[in-house]
Amino acid sequence: MKISFHGQSCIKIITGNTTILVDPFISGNEKCDLKAEEQMPDFIVLSHGHDDHVGDTVEIAKNSGATVICNADLASFLAVEDGLENIAAMHIGGKRQFEFGQVKLTQAFHGSQTVRNGRIINLGFPTGVVFTIENKNIYFAGDTGLFSDMKLIGELNPLDVAFLPIGDNFTMGPEDAAIAARFLQTKLVIPMHYNTFPLIEQDPHKFVASLDEGISGKVLEIGESIEI
């Protein structure tokens, strides 16, 4: 399985012949190396409804026929307002098997809304995601602050990789993210959600250096990938 990082919180997972795109904030993101019109994933996974995470989902899903996996409230909005048909609606605590493996939604402490035609629309609870693919557990925290039940996420799902936001201001910063890594007891931590905007500028290498002994960290440059 190959996992690549594409700026902000956008990652791509390739397992066998299946491609999964997560939080595809591409257009308007100077830190992203992808082009929305070239993306042909089989699945799109959304952590929540903020524009810098939903991003180009509608265009990509309509062009590719991808199934969108997200919380049920956001799923209803995308179906009614944007005409998406291939949607797998879930909620926090639920897990579901797909052709590539299992998806389980976890809680996240953040918001989830958009503005459409001058209206503020709430889009349900934000989520994290635990992927179980090829007998590996990957935790994508989404946008979140630190919370103590991260310990439980790690206990229930022994983690091989965790993608954690470090940008501060809108999510946890590097100090709290290092505590999150300790709570999760993951084998590898990859920072995300930083340096896209001035308010979330951070040094990811300094964050990786701050991790507890026994927890590995890796900074993925834009477009860089790892194999697990």
From Swiss-Prot:
GO terms for molecular function: hydrolase activity. SMART domains: Lactamase_B. Keywords: Hydrolase. Pfam families: Lactamase_B_2. It comes from the Bacteria. InterPro entries: Metallo-B-lactamas, RibonucZ/Hydroxyglut_hydro, UPF0173, UPF0173_UPF0282_UlaG_hydrolase. Gene3D superfamilies: Ribonuclease Z/Hydroxyacylglutathione hydrolase-like. PANTHER family: UPF0173 METAL-DEPENDENT HYDROLASE MJ1163 (PTHR43546:SF3), UPF0173 METAL-DEPENDENT HYDROLASE MJ1163-RELATED (PTHR43546). Belongs to the UPF0173 family. HAMAP family: UPF0173. NCBIfam families: PRK00685.1. This is UPF0173 metal-dependent hydrolase lwe1590. It comes from Listeria welshimeri serovar 6b (strain ATCC 35897 / DSM 20650 / CCUG 15529 / CIP 8149 / NCTC 11857 / SLCC 5334 / V8).
